[in-house]
Structures are given as C-alpha cells and as structure tokens.
Design a protein with these regions (language model features):
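Bacterial N-terminal signal peptides that target proteins for export
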Residues: 1-6
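Hydrophobic h-region of N-terminal signal peptides that target proteins for export
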Residues: 8-17
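Short S/T/G/P-rich N-terminal loop/turn motif that feeds into the first structured element of a domain
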Residues: 16-98, 102-215, 220-238
Length: 238
C-alpha cells in the first residue's frame, strides 16, 4: 500500500505489457522511537516531492512485527538514468532541504538506508495504484538460488507457482530481479504477494505446500539439482 495513511494499495492486472521501468527497493531503518516521525516526513513532504521530480510512488509499507522499525518502499522511473537525475534534483530541492532540517531538530530519523535497483520479471503482474477499502497484509519474499539456477526458479514461478498461489488465496503483486551484480542480479528473486490477513496467510501457505500440483512441480524442477541456495527470507508488511 502507498503508506497506510493514504489508503492506497497496489492493483494487479494480468494483461500486462512488458514493463521496462527502473524500480528501486529502499529500506530505511529508523532510529529508536523515530519511525512515526519518518512516516510523517514521507506523508507530508517526501512522497509529493518524489512525484514533483519524476518518480512514481509504487508502494510504502512497515513490517507487521511492531518491534521492526523499518520503512520499506518501492519507487520507479522510466529508466536508470532518469532515476538518478530525479534523485539529484530531489536532494537539491529547497523544499526537501527545509523539510529534512525541520524533521531532525530532535535527532536524526534514519540509522541505515539500503537500496536495490530492480527490473520486473516477464511474468510479473502489471503494477498500478488504486484506492481500496479492504486492507491487506503483504509479504515480501527474497529467494537466492544456487549457481546458474535463477532461470529455473523463474520458470517454476512462471509455469506453476504463481497460478498455485492464486488457487490458495495469495495475490501476486510484483516480481523482480536485481539489476546490479553486487545485489544479486544472477541469483536473486524478490517478490511481493498479499493475503487477506496474517492469520489467513498461514492457512494459505499450508494449503499451498500440501497442494499436489505444487509437489509435482517442485519435484520436477529439482530433478537436475536444487534450485535454492538457502531458505527464502520473508517479512509481513502492512
């Protein structure tokens, strides 16, 4: 969703044309007690200034786990060059400088920033924004493959996993791979799905794992060797 106080969420269309946009996943770890102030800065200033300088606000979330003090968001631009130019103009905007100075009068808000540039996979749903009255729980998942197995993982999602997710109440939101080698371009899949709520997510996964179609697809996909190098990482988001 596009920050909870805006009540916007990602809207999925499966009639998606090829998406060549540059996406950036940014993770801000707030200093202790500063997450609310960080959200306020985005709500009142940053999101609007991003749009002013050519960014598209794709989605903003905070972890469902209350002890996790991160803000996780995705923005996009037509391409990497324009993305970098937009950030430069954003940082030089007097309105941003004023908002930033005002926000840190009582201490800096952010302890750490992580950034990953992304491109959509050929099976990712189209990513748009719409307004909804029904909040959802989102799940951000990261898979790291064994050597030379990313194509196999993508094939399994394209041909089987995404469809089976839908059969078990999971909505496919977006699928990406990193564009930079040092961020895992050769072995990493990052995706977002959604559930009605976190309790339902447990049931959705239980149904998926026990699905015979999934068991067959997984068994066939690993006949010539394992696909994943390690267990997937996930975080529930709201």
């Amino acid at each position: 969703k596009y920050l909870s106080f805006f009540s916007w969420v990602l809207f999925i269309s499966f009639a998606a044309a090829e998406d060549n946009r540059c996406y950036e996943l940014r993770v801000y770890t707030a200093n202790e007690g500063k997450l609310d102030a960080l959200n306020a800065r985005f709500r009142d200033h940053t999101c609007k200034l991003f749009e002013k300088h050519g960014f598209t606000n794709v989605g903003y979330w905070t972890p469902a786990e209350k002890s996790d003090n991160r803000l996780i968001y995705v923005i996009s631009s037509p391409n990497r060059k324009s993305h970098n130019e937009s950030f430069k103009s954003f940082l030089n905007d007097p309105d941003w400088k004023n908002a930033y100075r005002a926000s840190i009068k009582n201490g800096k808000l952010v302890a750490k920033i992580e950034s990953t540039f992304l491109k959509t996979t050929d099976y990712s749903p189209k990513i748009e924004s719409t307004i909804t009255k029904n909040p959802r729980i989102f799940e951000l998942r990261t898979y790291v493959t064994a050597n030379d197995r990313l194509d196999n993982l993508n094939a399994r999602f394209r041909d089987h996993t995404c469809k089976i997710f839908e059969n078990h109440g999971m909505k496919n939101v977006a699928y990406w791979t990193p564009t930079d080698e040092n961020k895992g371009s050769a072995n990493t899949l990052i995706y977002i799905i959604s559930h009605k709520n976190q309790n339902q997510a447990k049931n959705n996964w239980k149904g998926f794992i026990s699905d015979e179609a999934w068991k067959k697809a997984r068994a066939a996909s690993v006949k010539d060797g394992k696909i994943l190098a390690s267990a997937p990482k996930n975080v529930f988001l709201k």
